[in-house]
């Protein structure tokens, strides 16, 4: 078994997931979007010395840049279904570019917001780490690999890996570095992870380092506080409430180590009534929703902020109030716009294993986990199921628009989704959790929605 075919080892040296933010102040963000050197290999095992480079735009999908053709499939995998193995002939794109570091003594991080399907990162010729999970943010500490001045990043991107068995979404299949990629140079002692929640009239801010905080209502400063034990609480008398129709947000700024982290938060409650009504702020709400794919006829999975705003404005014109991010997390900015423009979001984990219904075609179109080795019931996939839901939750846990987590799409239902639900409910006592296939995978004792 090759390392990229092992579901129990789908990353090396990738940092734990955290809330998404771009610090201001002393942090330096070095955007690596733009032209990269590029070499394409039909067989990635032969991706050795590269004497002649071509160039490619990043972010992009290489199938739309002249390397291979776009491939659409709904149910079937684009390769023989023999989990966790992928074809020996595994195309690979090699990306390389240089970047400047002003101060090599700072903490330095390399961030992928989306790369498909597996990426190996090298800095200045030294191996840093690898990651799977195409639509999930991956961050690496490269402090020990860089120095002041010119540095070089090289990324090997495999077309397929064991994680491809969990990414059988009904869509065109693409590969490459298809979302933003950048370097963050940050001061020592900086905040890494933050969380901001509301409880009744309180806004509760927590972080893994001490900080000062400010709360704003529009441009008006309401209050300043210093954290105690990494926690600061603001009380807002008679707060304005957030709904999809009235998306009222307050602004929180956290100050630490010369950095400023700015996030927005709204007051809203989520309940299921005794009559099984969805209540937002105590009022019954009917979800009028759509599935939204990250897809563009010319750019594939690469979506700009303008693309997202265009789609959301169209939804507003059509009186849509809910978005299911089918079937994976979108780029982070999409959820900022959902917060600001007013949408209820069902945020879906990057998991779909639909192709297993064809592996057991004699059973027919049903998700029969008792007569097949579906990933949802196989122990070897449990770590990856949990890793993907953890990364989904941790990145987007602050967003007010997110009212429900989804464990994935068309993947049957088994112990691995149950483990995902248990993990979610241990971390989030407010939002709903959802498994799309639970009700049709067998017993009605397996509910589709979990409170």
Regions found by a protein language model. Give the residues of each.
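Conserved, mostly hydrophobic/aromatic
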Residues: 36, 125, 181, 250, ...
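Aromatic- and glycine-enriched glycan-recognition loops and surfaces
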Residues: 87-94, 246-248, 300-332
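Short hydrophobic alpha-helix segments
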Residues: 129-131, 225-226, 263, 288, ...
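Extended acidic/polar, glycine-enriched regions
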Residues: 144-150, 206-274
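Surface beta-strand/loop "capping" patches
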Residues: 187-210
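N-terminal carbohydrate-binding accessory modules
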Residues: 191-197, 241, 253-315, 336
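Substrate-binding/catalytic cleft of secreted carbohydrate-active enzymes
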Residues: 204, 312-313, 322-451
């Amino acid at each position: 078994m090759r390392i990229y075919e092992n579901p129990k080892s789908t990353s090396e040296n990738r940092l734990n997931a955290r809330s998404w933010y771009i610090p201001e102040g002393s942090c330096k963000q070095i955007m690596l979007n733009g032209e990269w050197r590029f070499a394409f290999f039909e067989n990635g095992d032969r991706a050795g010395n590269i004497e002649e480079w071509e160039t490619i735009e990043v972010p992009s999908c290489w199938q739309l840049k002249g390397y291979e053709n776009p491939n659409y499939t709904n149910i079937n995998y684009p390769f023989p279904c023999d989990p966790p193995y992928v074809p020996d002939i595994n195309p690979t794109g090699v990306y390389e570019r240089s970047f400047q570091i002003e101060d090599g003594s700072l903490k330095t991080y390399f961030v992928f917001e989306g790369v498909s399907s597996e990426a190996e990162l090298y800095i200045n010729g030294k191996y840093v780490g690898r990651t799977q999970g195409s639509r999930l943010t991956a961050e690496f500490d490269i402090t020990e690999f860089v120095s002041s001045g010119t540095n070089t990043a090289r990324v090997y991107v495999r077309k397929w890996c064991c994680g491809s068995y969990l990414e059988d979404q009904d869509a065109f299949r693409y590969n490459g570095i298809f979302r933003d990629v950048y370097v963050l140079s940050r001061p020592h002692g900086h905040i890494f992870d933050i969380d901001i929640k509301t409880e009744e009239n309180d806004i509760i801010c927590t972080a893994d380092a001490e900080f000062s905080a400010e709360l704003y209502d529009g441009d008006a400063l309401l209050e300043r506080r210093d954290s105690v034990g990494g926690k600061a609480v603001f009380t807002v008398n008679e707060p304005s409430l957030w709904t999809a129709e009235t998306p009222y947000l307050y602004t929180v700024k956290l100050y630490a180590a010369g950095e400023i982290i700015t996030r927005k938060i709204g007051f809203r409650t989520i309940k299921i009534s005794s009559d099984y009504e969805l209540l937002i702020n105590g009022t019954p709400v009917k979800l009028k929703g759509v599935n939204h794919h990250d897809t563009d006829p010319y750019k594939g999975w690469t979506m700009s902020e303008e693309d997202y705003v265009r789609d959301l404005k169209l939804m507003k014109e059509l009186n849509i109030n809910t978005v299911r991010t089918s079937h994976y997390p979108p780029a982070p900015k999409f959820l900022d716009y959902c917060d600001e423009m007013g949408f209820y979001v069902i945020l879906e984990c990057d998991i779909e294993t639909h192709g297993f219904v064809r592996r057991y075609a004699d059973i027919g179109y049903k998700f029969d986990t008792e007569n097949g080795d579906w990933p949802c019931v196989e122990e070897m996939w449990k770590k990856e199921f949990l890793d993907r839901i953890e990364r989904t939750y941790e990145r987007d846990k602050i967003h007010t628009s997110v009212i429900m987590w989804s464990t994935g799409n068309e993947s049957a239902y088994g112990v691995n989704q149950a483990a995902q639900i248990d993990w979610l409910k241990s971390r989030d006592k407010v939002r709903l959790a959802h498994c799309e296939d639970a009700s049709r995978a067998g017993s009605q004792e397996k509910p589709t929605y979990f409170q």
